[in-house]
A protein has these predicted regions:
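Conserved N-terminal structural module of periplasmic/extracytoplasmic solute-binding proteins
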Residues: 2-130, 195, 327-329, 368, ...
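Extracytoplasmic/periplasmic substrate-recognition and gating elements
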Residues: 79, 191, 273, 312-376, ...
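Hinge/lid segment of periplasmic solute-binding proteins
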Residues: 120-178, 319-321
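Short, solvent-exposed loop/beta-turn-alpha elements that line the ligand-binding surface or hinge
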Residues: 135-150, 238-262, 312-313, 324-333, ...
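Extracytoplasmic/periplasmic solute-binding protein
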Residues: 160-174, 179, 203-253, 297
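Glycine-centered hinge/linker elements that transmit conformational signals in sensory
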Residues: 208, 249-281
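C-terminal capping/gating helix-and-loop segments adjacent to ligand/active sites or protein-protein/ligand interfaces
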Residues: 246-249, 376-381, 395-449
């Protein structure tokens, strides 16, 4: 599948347009005031002027593919700047969420961190004065023109952390990502099933797969974030992009609206009928993905960041699709850009930190990402994944989501500062049949309404 530079950059702009209306250890001081502007000190690209530096970097690039790319980029950076030593602390997404704030408020915070967008993480860090605005570095390195404006907006907050997608820039992202359905081509072919395009087509296949003795959907939610993805793509494919986008951004709607309750009912029905892994709350995401990779399930629902693992396990038999509502040619799914690479206010070497961020997100980095099976936020020129491959599927679905009216919705946990915990716990209770779909929706709405009232 061939895609020109213009097409790739158009996709990035389209992604932004879909999301612009919307709104996945050590490293200063323990008390920082919110910074309304970037540092008064002049910024520089001269990394050598810093002398010998140990740059502490916290990231969540632990998965195969993205970890390989990060290791290679760190190696290249240190070769280019031999006066800099990268001290990398890499943790899973869930571990990073629970430990990063403690690190940022320590006496020796990291220099560079990956901060999750939205109110729970980035908004909290900004309000606490823990992240440095990067607008000056964006001009110095050209991030303000390299990245589409709407992508940059996802990494912006007002200095008090109260308003997302406006104010100062607090990071740039390395990857693009969407959540979708990975499928086993061989299993579908053996059962005479076509690749589903809508949520109804997908659901219609599940009884046939189950009757064949095969598990339809491998699913593990011990980390809790997979539950957000499961509900997100189901809700999006039922409710549609506009309804979910306006809900997450607090513009209209309620989590107790009929489509959101229907999405919860759909997921609980899958659990009741044995369409997803039994006891999923005690099974890890990686174990579920491994079962899919061994050919023990027809589908697994997760993000494009897992494509290197699927390529390794299934090779040509692995496929990827994003589902859409009935009657729509555009899939609707959860996604956006990867976690922002941010500079902490406690960093003693912000110029070096900015040079590092530029190095791991620039055009050269995009090619390294692609070479290791990842989807970059801004793709390099003449990117052309081989037709019929999983990487081509991912590129095609990324394009479909970001063309026309757009079908990309933000991650649901961006909705409130506490929504990650509320939603992830509620999905576990939903699949364990400890909450009815209506009770599930009411729990989400209670959190959401309280946040809107507090603004």
């Amino acid at each position: 599948m061939s895609r020109s530079t213009k097409t790739i950059r158009t996709l990035a702009v389209s992604l932004a347009l879909a999301l612009a209306t919307t709104a996945c250890a050590p490293g200063g001081s323990t008390t920082n005031e919110p910074a309304a502007n970037s540092s008064a000190s002049p910024v520089s690209k001269d990394v050598s002027a810093a002398g010998d530096v140990t740059l502490t970097v916290w990231d969540q690039n632990t998965d195969t593919g993205i970890n390989d790319a990060q290791v290679e980029l760190n190696k290249q950076f240190q070769q280019k700047y031999p006066n800099v030593k990268i001290e990398r602390v890499s943790r899973s997404f869930s571990d990073l969420k629970t430990t990063l704030k403690l690190a940022l408020t320590s006496k020796d915070p990291p220099d560079v961190v990956q901060a999750n967008q939205g109110y729970p993480d980035m908004g909290s860090f900004v309000s606490g004065g823990l992240l440095r605005p990067e607008d000056d570095y964006a001009k110095l390195y050209g991030w303000d023109t390299y990245f589409p404006e709407q992508q940059l907006n996802l990494n912006k907050f007002t200095a008090d952390g109260k308003d997302w997608q406006s104010g100062n820039l607090y990071g740039v992202s390395q990857t693009g990502e969407i959540v979708g359905v990975y499928y086993n081509r061989k299993i579908l072919k053996n059962l005479n099933l076509q690749v589903p395009k809508t949520i109804t087509e997908f659901e219609a296949m599940l009884p046939t797969i189950k009757a064949s003795g095969m598990l339809p959907i491998a699913y593990g939610d011990v980390e809790k974030s997979p539950g957000i993805h499961l509900y997100g793509i189901t809700q999006g494919a039922i409710a549609g992009e506009q309804a979910v986008t306006e809900l997450v951004t607090g513009r209209s709607g309620a989590w107790t609206d009929e489509p959101s309750v229907k999405a919860a009912q759909t997921i609980q029905d899958w659990a009741t009928k044995g369409y997803i892994t039994e006891g999923a709350n005690g099974i890890s995401r990686d174990d579920a993905l491994a079962e899919f990779g061994k050919g023990k399930s027809a589908f697994v629902i997760t993000g494009t960041w897992e494509q290197p693992k699927v390529i390794k396990s299934l090779g040509a038999d692995g496929g990827f699709v994003a589902l859409g509502p009935d009657g729509s040619d555009t899939p609707v799914t959860t996604g956006g850009v990867g976690l922002a690479w941010s500079i902490t206010t406690g960093s003693k070497h912000p110029d070096v930190a900015a040079a590092y961020i530029d190095f791991i997100t620039n055009a050269n980095a995009s090619q390294v990402l692609i070479d290791n099976g990842n989807l970059p936020a801004v793709a390099p020129e003449n990117w052309a994944p081989k037709a019929g491959t999983l990487q081509a599927d991912v590129a095609n679905e990324w394009k479909r989501v970001n063309t026309g009216s757009g079908g990309l919705v933000p991650y649901l946990d961006y909705a409130t500062p506490t929504f990650y915990d509320t939603l992830s716990a509620a999905v576990q209770q939903l699949t364990a049949k400890k909450l009815t779909p209506q009770q599930f929706a009411e729990q989400l709405q209670k959190d959401y309404a309280a946040f809107l009232k507090s603004k």
